């Protein structure tokens, strides 16, 4: 339908009692887990809580959906898929924290690997050793440097802004991302970290939930 989610939320926000909930990856130690306590007890009592379970199915498959749309953008722009370097910004379960528990960014990472791409994750908020131990993902030391301090030497085919850390907007504006990417710059901006109009005006390929 080509309806922009942010525009819908802004319009709905003109109602005084509107509660704003944005689409994204639902991870962490509570929201992504606690509903199952309720559904388990409900089913023991003979009730099938379809609405809650449907919501969890959608959330649990969001990483796959984002990865698939990233691949579609590579195809649409004529970029390679096999061996494509893809940068993922952020791995904590939400913005501006260090907590990596039940991060759904890992779902994007694994799905991209299934397409034989080379996903790289950078998150200055996360503890490298914990991410390595928990998810077997070696975080970049910088957006162009591998965990072994070896330059990647190849630009990224796409960049996924997975977590809306303030530091990403401050340290990595669009012109910086353009410098490390093949043309056109593909930005998969899950929670709207960057300005959509600015991206499109600069000829970038932009997609968000």
Cite the ranges covered by each PLM segment:
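Structural/interface elements that position substrates and couple domains in central-metabolism enzymes
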Residues: 1-209
